[in-house]
């Protein structure tokens, strides 16, 4: 690869990193909550569930219907009177008109309506918990990608520094060769190393672009690619394992949803039992009717009536073939199944919490060790670089120290963000991820 082309490519890339917008964690969360497609969807579901809890959807209000009708007929008829006289009515027209308003109201339905309405309220709470879980998952996904971008930014900077050192080494090797102080081999080795560093830098640059696009997707495509993320992180003070475990059993969103499902099923049992009781209804209506005809045989040419009517009705299914009994039994069995599911979930949740806690502690310790390893690698590189400049170390030893330092930096960066993501996974399990400052 032409060294001039490499330098131009790296320069252009470096210029692209200057003065870019900083996307802070708080801003990323704000953008995700406002624009993420999944969160928008669940917010709509919450609105629907809230609408379902309205008194208009409760069954407590009466129904009022209006009816109207009209008819027309034209007939030929013949009638014989008592005195033997016969009369005919040809083309006699009859018109009928009617209108009514009808009221129906259920006074008592065995309390089924009450328990159904309570179900709607609990289902609304369940939908809110489902929305919360979606938001928690989105926040975890957001920061998994966010910190991947941060890691790649730090990796790119580290590789850029390595490239700059290799560039300086190549310049030195070329000068030394020009003045007869070294062989052409040293210059060629330096050129090979700078080629490798440039390839690593371009790959890191491409990965960074890809992950920025992934991050932008989670944010609802609200940003362009010219942004940086905050690489300064702090870890939460998660010292008391038992206290956090208790919070997990109280606030884990999936466990809370199971509790709501159990509550809903208990209401279903009560609602199904309402089938054992009678239903009492109230009816009322106001009607108007008019009939007119021009038949000479008719005693009344026009008749109009209007008035109110009302009544009570009672229905009691003394035996419905056993369907109510079957539904009640099945609802009780479903309640047992849900409680078994909850017991299993709690055991699984405790296991997942312990795994997440140990994983977090392990990764946090690895990060701290890698921080110490950086100091050792940096010290080793500084010494080797000084010897190399004095001619007391060869290019192979210098390159190895350079690679060791770069690998230590890349490993430290990975350990740093792995520990942070592990912390967020632990907070997600415990139901605390929305209560911490990012």
Where are these predicted regions, by residue range?
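Small/polar, glycine/serine/threonine/aspartate-rich low-complexity segments that form flexible
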Residues: 67-105, 230-237, 270, 283-316, ...
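Bacterial Sec-dependent N-terminal signal peptides
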Residues: 1-26, 36, 438
């Amino acid at each position: 690869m032409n060294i001039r082309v490499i330098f131009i490519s790296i320069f252009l890339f470096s210029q692209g990193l200057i003065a870019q917008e900083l996307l802070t964690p708080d801003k990323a969360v704000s953008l995700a909550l406002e624009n993420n497609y999944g969160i928008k969807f669940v917010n709509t579901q919450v609105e629907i569930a809230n609408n379902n809890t309205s008194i208009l959807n409760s069954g407590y209000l009466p129904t009022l219907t209006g009816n109207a009708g009209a008819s027309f007929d034209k007939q030929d008829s013949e009638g014989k009177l008592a005195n033997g006289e016969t009369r005919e009515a040809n083309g006699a027209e009859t018109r009928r008109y009617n209108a009514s308003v009808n009221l129906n109201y259920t006074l008592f339905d065995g309390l089924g309506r009450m328990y159904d309405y309570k179900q709607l309220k609990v289902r609304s709470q369940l939908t809110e918990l489902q929305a919360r879980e979606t938001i928690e998952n989105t926040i975890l996904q957001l920061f998994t990608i966010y910190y991947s971008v941060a890691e790649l930014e730090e990796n790119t900077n580290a590789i850029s520094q390595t490239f700059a050192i290799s560039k300086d080494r190549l310049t030195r090797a070329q000068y030394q060769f020009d003045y007869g102080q070294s062989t052409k081999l040293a210059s060629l080795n330096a050129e090979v190393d700078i080629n490798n560093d440039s390839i690593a830098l371009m790959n890191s640059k491409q990965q960074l672009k890809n992950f920025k696009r992934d991050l932008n997707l989670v944010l609802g495509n609200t940003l362009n690619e010219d942004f940086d993320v905050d690489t300064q992180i702090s870890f939460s003070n998660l010292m008391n394992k038992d206290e956090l475990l208790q919070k997990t059993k109280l606030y884990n969103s999936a466990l809370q949803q199971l509790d709501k499902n159990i509550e809903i099923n208990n209401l279903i049992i009560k609602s199904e039992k309402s089938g054992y009781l009678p239903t009492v209804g109230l009816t009322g209506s106001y009607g108007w009717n008019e009939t007119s005809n021009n038949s000479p045989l008719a005693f009344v040419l026009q008749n109009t009536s209007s008035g109110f009517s009302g009544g009570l009705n009672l229905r009691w299914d003394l035996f419905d073939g056993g369907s109510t009994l079957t539904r009640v039994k099945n609802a009780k069995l479903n309640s047992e199944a849900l409680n078994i599911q909850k017991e299993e979930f709690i055991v699984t949740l405790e296991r997942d919490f312990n795994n997440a806690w140990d994983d977090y502690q392990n990764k946090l310790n690895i990060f701290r060790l890698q921080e110490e390893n950086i100091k050792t690698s940096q010290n080793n590189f500084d010494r080797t670089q000084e010897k190399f400049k004095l001619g007391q170390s060869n290019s192979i030893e210098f390159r190895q120290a350079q690679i060791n330092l770069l690998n230590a930096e890349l490993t430290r960066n990975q350990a740093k963000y792995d520990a942070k993501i592990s912390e967020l996974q632990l907070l997600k399990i415990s139901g605390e991820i929305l209560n911490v400052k990012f």
